[in-house]
Amino acid sequence: FLPMIAKLLGGLL
């Protein structure tokens, strides 16, 4: 995943 996507997923988790 892209850094931005990973950041969004990290926020959800």
Curated annotation (Swiss-Prot):
Record-given protein name: Vespid chemotactic peptide A
Compartment(s) of residence: Secreted
Family: Belongs to the MCD family. Crabrolin subfamily.
One Gene Ontology MF term: toxin activity
Highest taxon of source: Eukaryota
GO cellular component terms given for this protein: extracellular region
Known role: Mast cell degranulating peptide. Induces the chemotaxis of neutrophils. Its mast cell degranulation activity may be related to the activation of G-protein coupled receptors in mast cells as well as interaction with other proteins located in cell endosomal membranes in the mast cells.
Modified residues (Leucine amide): 13
Chief location category: secreted
The organism of origin for this protein: Vespa analis (Yellow-vented hornet)
Single GO BP term: chemotaxis
Record's keyword terms, sorted: Amidation, Chemotaxis, G-protein coupled receptor impairing toxin, Mast cell degranulation, Secreted, Toxin
Expressing tissues: Expressed by the venom gland.
